[in-house]
Amino acid sequence: MDAVELARRLQEEATCSICLDYFTDPVMTACGHNFCRECIQMSWEKGKGKKGKKKQKGSFPCPECREMSPQRNLRPNRLLTKVAEMARQHPGLHKRDLCQIHQEPLKLFCQDDQTPICVVCREAQEHRMHRVLPLDEAAREYKLRLEEDIKYLREEMMKTETLQAKEEQTLTEWQERVKERRERILEEFQKVVLFLVEEERRLLQILKKEEDDTLGKLQDSKASLDHQSRSLDLILLQLEEQTQQEPLQMLQDVKDTLTRKESLSMQYPEVVLPVAIKTVCRVPGQIEVLKSFQEDVVPDPSTAYPYLLLYESRQRRYLSPPPEGSAPYSKDRFLAYPCAVGQKSFSSGRHYWEVGMNLTGDALWALGVCRDNVSRKDRVLKSPENGFWVVQLSKGKKHLPLLPNSIPVTLTEPPSHMGIFLDFQAGEVSFYSVNDGSHLHSFSQVAFPGPLLPFFCLGSPKSGQMVISTVTMWVKG
């Protein structure tokens, strides 16, 4: 008997016929057959519920020979326990070395199914037409293939580990850069905050000095006028009393009275209202912040006054054709003034746009926002009550007239580049000079009554041009 056959026989002896695995706690029945204790007990438990011939009390049939065996006569087989343990530990006696179907040694390898088979499997219908190699030959062939795969996978593992190391380094460097940038942002903003606090203090000090100086001059002027008024009152009273006297009495003192009147020095200081405030409200960096809300605002040619020309510089064409070839009287077109509104209306959010102004010294113009339903056929006052929130400059005056009876904003120079900021939810529209970043004026109210449109207006052909985004606007002469 060769070693393989001996191993097979030994494996059979160490295998339970119920679970087909090596014995665990083997016991022997009265008839001499061996089973795992748990396997034979489970087999007999299942047999209790089956109908059949009457069994002796406490006796059950042997699963191998069907001979009746008392349950209490199960005897532990310690020798078989050692044999089963040896079979488990011996590499040549593993269960996987035998065919699970035929219990024959696995000596062949099916290349089609890529699985070991026994000689009985080789002749079976399932493998009869398959390519089959001896197990050792197949092992050598597949070992080479596996070694190639191992080499490839090790190379890939090295690449992966290299990339992992690079990614970890990149992650560390990135986190460090983020940390540095965060610290830099906090540091720079702290500098800006300190700078703004100092700038605020400086501007307020300048304004306070200007207030004190101007207030002193105004108070001195007022005091002088008060003194002059009292002197005039006194002389006037004396003259009125003297005119009521008898002729002789009146004429006796007339020389002194006239002398006092002639000696009175009259002073009339020039009073200019409103007094111009020289201190400019300029917040450093504010225009840059507002530009984060910048919109591409373009005038709507269908709303433009018939003689208001819109020229698109990029496309090199008129957006609104000259009046000779247009139909000027559409319902959306402004007819009372050389005005136009933007193509897009705003009913929420924050929006900022800029307008360049190449205007003459006596230009008439207006900028701002208006309701989408303002009167376009009639001349109306451009006021919030009529749906206009605009600033305007007229006839070269260096101030922006706003509302009737309001104090106009005084300018050192008319702006050539203006910014308009609309905060719809806050009910506020503000105007800035982009040239120096100064704030010119703001309209504030609880809420706007409806959608708003950017508003542009030129007064006459002599006013010059406005540039809105890439569109140039002027009045045809």
From Swiss-Prot:
Class of the enzyme per the UniProt entry, highest EC level: transferase
Post-translational modification comment from the UniProt entry: Auto-ubiquitinated.
Organism lineage string: Eukaryota, Metazoa, Chordata, Craniata, Vertebrata
Free-text function comment from the UniProt entry: E3 ubiquitin ligase that plays important roles in the regulation of neuronal apoptosis, selective autophagy or cell proliferation. Stimulates the degradation of kinetochore ZW10 interacting protein ZWINT in a proteasome-dependent manner, leading to negative regulation of cell proliferation. Inhibits autophagic degradation of diverse known targets while contributing to autophagy of midbodies. Autophagy-inhibitory activity involves MCL1, which TRIM17 assembles into complexes with the key autophagy regulator BECN1.
EC number: 2.3.2.27
Subunit structure: Interacts (via coiled coil) with TRIM44 (via coiled coil). Interacts with TRIM28; this interaction prevents TRIM28 activity on BCL2A1. Interacts with TRIM41; this interaction prevents TRIM41 activity on ZSCAN2. Interacts with BECN1. Interacts with NFATC3 and NFATC4; these interactions prevent NFATC3 and NFATC4 nuclear localization.
InterPro entries noted in UniProt: B30.2/SPRY, B30.2/SPRY_sf, Butyrophylin_SPRY, ConA-like_dom_sf, PRY, SPRY_dom, TRIM/RBCC, TRIM17_PRY/SPRY
Name recorded for this polypeptide: E3 ubiquitin-protein ligase TRIM17
Family: Belongs to the TRIM/RBCC family.
UniProt binding sites for Zn(2+): 99, 102, 121, 127
GO biological process: autophagy; innate immune response; protein autoubiquitination; regulation of gene expression; regulation of protein localization
Zn finger region (RING-type): 16-66
Domain B30.2/SPRY: from-to ranges: 276-475
Species in which this protein is naturally found: Rattus norvegicus (Rat)
Keywords: Coiled coil, Cytoplasm, Lysosome, Metal-binding, Transferase, Ubl conjugation, Ubl conjugation pathway, Zinc, Zinc-finger
Keyword check for NAD: no
Subcellular localization(s) per the UniProt record: Cytoplasm; Lysosome
Domain of life: Eukaryota
Catalysed reaction, written as an equation: S-ubiquitinyl-[E2 ubiquitin-conjugating enzyme]-L-cysteine + [acceptor protein]-L-lysine = [E2 ubiquitin-conjugating enzyme]-L-cysteine + N(6)-ubiquitinyl-[acceptor protein]-L-lysine
Gene behind this protein: Trim17
UniProt keyword annotation of Magnesium present: no
GO molecular function list: protein-macromolecule adaptor activity; ubiquitin protein ligase activity; ubiquitin-protein transferase activity; zinc ion binding
Stored Pfam families: SPRY (PF00622), zf-B_box (PF00643), zf-RING_UBOX (PF13445)
Expression tissues: Expressed almost exclusively in the testis.
Pathway the protein contributes to: Protein modification; protein ubiquitination
